[in-house]
Amino acid sequence: LQAHPLKLSLCQIEYASVEKTLTIELRLFLMDVNEALVFDPDNNELGLGQPDEVPNAEGMLLDYLNRFFYIKANGKQLALKIKSMSLNGQGNDAALGLTFSYPSQEKITSIEIKNAVFTDLFFDQSNVVYVHVDDDSRSLMLNKKTPVHKLVY
């Protein structure tokens, strides 16, 4: 199999003060996840997001994400705990969707995002981040050179 040419991840962060919830959705190409965790893009032995997922697969994924990804809301780093995981597409285009959700009683005044996912593997990796805080929407492109960005509201 040939690797997909697009070295990209997508992250969407949403905070609605009415619901008092901060939601993070992260979409990663499954081939890249396998490359990062078992060093073989075509090896699907972990079965992430599938009925036959191996017991330690989610832990391995979280260990990796904790090294390359974080969100700080109002200066406090959020502990990564996967609320839901889904697999969409197939073959080289299969994407793993992760959702994280956090109650947030206080108004969001700043969000700091680090998304260096897969920059350890691919020099041309780009990580697109969309941030929606109530009616304020912004988009960022994070990469190996610029892995962190802070937004102030």
Located regions from the model:
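N-terminal soluble domains immediately following signal/targeting peptides that reside
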Residues: 3-153
